[in-house]
Amino acid sequence: MGIKALAGRDLLAIADLTIEEMKSLLQLAADLKSGVLKPHCRKILGLLFYKASTRTRVSFTAAMYQLGGQVLDLNPSVTQVGRGEPIQDTARVLDRYIDILAVRTFKQTDLQTFADHAKMPIINALSDLEHPCQILADLQTIKECFGKLEGLTVTYLGDGNNVAHSLILGGVMMGMTVRVATPKNYEPLAEIVQQAQQIAAPGGKVELTDDPKAAAQGSHILYTDVWASMGQEDLADSRIPIFQPYQINQELLALADPEAIVLHCLPAHRGEEITDAVMEGPQSRLWDQAENRMHAQKALMVALLGLV
């Protein structure tokens, strides 16, 4: 069925997609970016973000405007959901007004509650468990650089957080080796690793280590994120000495494949998880990666709204 099977569905986690559906989404994103396809709609996207956002908010907004639709910013601080209205009530009401809803929240279970009580598609715009929209853009960027995904090795260095979770799942579904290098006690959730082993395409696998240099050796992509996620700001300073060996710098990058690229989902703490020299260097693809958030999310909305 491919892309058409996504019409009316939700995307709460990256593994909500089949391997075929993910490949179709990535191709659709490429076609939208190149202008091969120019769908048009008069749909309304709602953004309900309980956490701060730059790239996700702006890229979703720009994507819907480019499609000819409208966007409502449903800030919890000025809507009743921020004053305690139950999620199920908010979901039922919004379902009568808008066509698709992107939610950035803390609990994955909140996303499921929205999905259970609304007929419109619900998109996970980041939760504490996963960040599927980010990984769609990451995979699009990697494919643009290498012309393929299968057989590549991507190394994630740092905290085993929501981005790491979605990268593990999305990467193995595309037949990639996903190496994750974290300090001890900061590994990705065991259930995510187990799930990845169950859904991996041929050639896809997860490798966990606490050795950043071994993880970087020969890798095609080095990827990092902040060492303390949103809501963990009080832990940031104490984590710096723990995570310092996992910084992507010129020394670590030299261990990777000579044609390796560097990714970061942003925002970055320059000089902590990644150096200025690497961010601004010739192997950095951070700005292409950020741009592709718009194209990947446009493809996702086009598919979920049944516009193709």
Swiss-Prot record:
List, alphabetically, the Pfam families matched.
OTCace, OTCace_N
The record's principal subcellular location, in a coarse class, is cytoplasm
What are the BP-aspect GO terms?
Answer: arginine biosynthetic process via ornithine; citrulline biosynthetic process; L-arginine biosynthetic process
InterPro entries documented for this protein? Asp/Orn_carbamoyltranf_P-bd, Asp/Orn_carbamoylTrfase, Asp/Orn_carbamoylTrfase_sf, Asp_carbamoyltransf_Asp/Orn-bd, Orn/put_carbamltrans, OTCase_ArgI
Reactions this protein catalyses: carbamoyl phosphate + L-ornithine = L-citrulline + phosphate + H(+)
Alphabetized GO MF terms: amino acid binding; ornithine carbamoyltransferase activity
Residue positions annotated to bind L-ornithine are 162, 225, 229-230
Q: Where in the cell is it found?
A: Cytoplasm
| GO CC annotations, alphabetized | cytoplasm
Check the UniProt entry and state the signal peptide residues, or none: none
- Show the coiled coil region(s): none
Pathway stated in the Swiss-Prot or TrEMBL entry: Amino-acid biosynthesis; L-arginine biosynthesis; L-arginine from L-ornithine and carbamoyl phosphate: step 1/3
- This entry's Enzyme Commission designation comes to 2.1.3.3
Q: Which UniProt keywords apply?
A: Amino-acid biosynthesis, Arginine biosynthesis, Cytoplasm, Transferase
Q: Which residues bind carbamoyl phosphate?
A: 53-56, 80, 104, 131-134, 265-266, 293
State the family named in the UniProt similarity comment for this chain.
Belongs to the aspartate/ornithine carbamoyltransferase superfamily. OTCase family.
What does this gene product do? Reversibly catalyzes the transfer of the carbamoyl group from carbamoyl phosphate (CP) to the N(epsilon) atom of ornithine (ORN) to produce L-citrulline.
NCBIfam families referenced in this protein's UniProt entry, alphabetically: orni_carb_tr, PRK00779.1
For this protein, the record's PANTHER family field holds:
ORNITHINE CARBAMOYLTRANSFERASE, MITOCHONDRIAL, ORNITHINE TRANSCARBAMYLASE, MITOCHONDRIAL
**HAMAP family xref list:** OTCase
Q: What is the protein's name according to its record?
A: Ornithine carbamoyltransferase
Q: Which gene encodes it?
A: argF
